[in-house]
Each structure stands twice: as C-alpha cells, then as structure tokens.
Amino acid sequence: MAEVLGEMAGVVARITVQVGDQVSAGQELLVVESMKMEIPLLAPIGGTVQEVRVAVGAFVQAGDVLAVVEP
C-alpha cells in the first residue's frame, strides 16, 4: 500500500482518478492549489487506486493522506 500525502496546505483543485482505476508510477492523481500554484500529486507506484479521501474544494494540510494506491 502506498499513501499519497499532501505536500503543502492548499485546496484540492481537481481529482483525475477514481477508486478502482489502474495507474502507473508517476501518473497524476490529483492537483492541489496553494499560493496560486497548482501542485500535481503523483502515484508513487503503479497499481490500483483503493481510496480517494478528499473531494474537490477540500482544504488539506501537508502530511494528510489524500489517496491510497495498492500494487
């Protein structure tokens, strides 16, 4: 299991995957907007998206678990 963590505080701008999607390592999973920048969060491993724990518009903190990918 690989958790995708927020890198900095911000607002979820978009989610580009759904639970059950197959993803490759390095694939964009979601984008967080912080200080007028968009920060893409990428899959750390290839596998299946098991959880997406946030919704568009949600405020997140650095270190929050935003998604989970299983190999």
Outline where the language-model segments fall.
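Short beta-strand-turn/beta-hairpin segments enriched in glycine/proline and small hydrophobics
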Residues: 1-11, 31-44, 71
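Generic recognition of well-ordered secondary-structure surfaces with a strong bias
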Residues: 6, 41, 54, 59-60
